[in-house]
Amino acid sequence: MKDKVSFPFSPDRPLCVPKLFTISAPAGAGKTTLVRMLAEEFPDSFQKTVSLTTRSPRPEEVHGVDYYFVSQEEFLKRLDSGDFLEWVALFGEYYGTSRLEIDKIWKSGKHAIAVIDVEGALALRSKIPTVTIFISAPSLEELERRLKHRGSEQDAQRQERLQHSLIEQAASSKFEYVIINDDLEKSYEILKSIFIAEEHRNVL
């Protein structure tokens, strides 16, 4: 039987049970920007989980904010200790979500938002009641344009990510909500309405 993780009740918001939201999307679909907008507007309600990864940080990324950047040795050590609720090897690097990270956010009375890949989101849902959201780019051509504009991958890496995006897009039907991000402000309003509705959903 898989481990189950129960929600703590928030003393500051007694009618609200902290939830876990997962947001998944192909690279370049806009998930990071949308989550940042949500956290900035609702800092007392939502907090993004910080995953661990063995990959090198991009120029704009900050340790402890975007990811915890760790060595492969440290990652595998924490994996062996059972620290991860989910983990995945992707593009030759490891990524994982710590159970302690989610618990810390819940105990603060906030909802946790995990920005993770499709496989990780579905793995989390098998262990924890999870609201799953998929962000899609309007087309593969637009996704490729955004990846080129980001400029953080070589051509071969970009093509690999595009192929992986097709696989992730095919899995979008397994998610409760799907948002096509063809307009950032419109997509944010849709995302915000989902979070507000879920926060007020009764736990029966």
UniProtKB/Swiss-Prot annotation:
Provide the Guanylate kinase-like domain boundaries. Answer: 18-196
Q: Does this UniProt record's set of keywords contain Cytoplasm?
A: yes
From the Swiss-Prot or TrEMBL record, what is one GO molecular function term?
Answer: ATP binding
Source species, please? Chlamydia felis (strain Fe/C-56) (Chlamydophila felis)
Which family does the record claim for this protein?
Belongs to the guanylate kinase family.
Keyword Transferase belongs to the record: yes
Q: Which reaction does it catalyse?
A: GMP + ATP = GDP + ADP
Residues bound to ATP: 25-32
Checking PROSITE patterns in the record gives: GUANYLATE_KINASE_1, GUANYLATE_KINASE_2
- List the keywords (alphabetical): ATP-binding, Cytoplasm, Kinase, Nucleotide-binding, Transferase
The protein here is known as Guanylate kinase
Where does the protein principally reside? cytoplasm
EC nos? 2.7.4.8
Listed SMART domains:
GuKc
From which domain of life does this come? Bacteria
The cellular component terms of Gene Ontology attached to this UniProt record, alphabetical and capped at eight, are: cytosol
Q: Where in the cell is it found?
A: Cytoplasm
Q: What is the recorded function of this protein according to its Swiss-Prot or TrEMBL entry?
A: Essential for recycling GMP and indirectly, cGMP.
InterPro entries in the cross-refs: GK/Ca_channel_bsu, Guanylate_kin-like_dom, Guanylate_kinase, Guanylate_kinase_CS, P-loop_NTPase
What NCBIfam families does the record point to? Answer: guanyl_kin
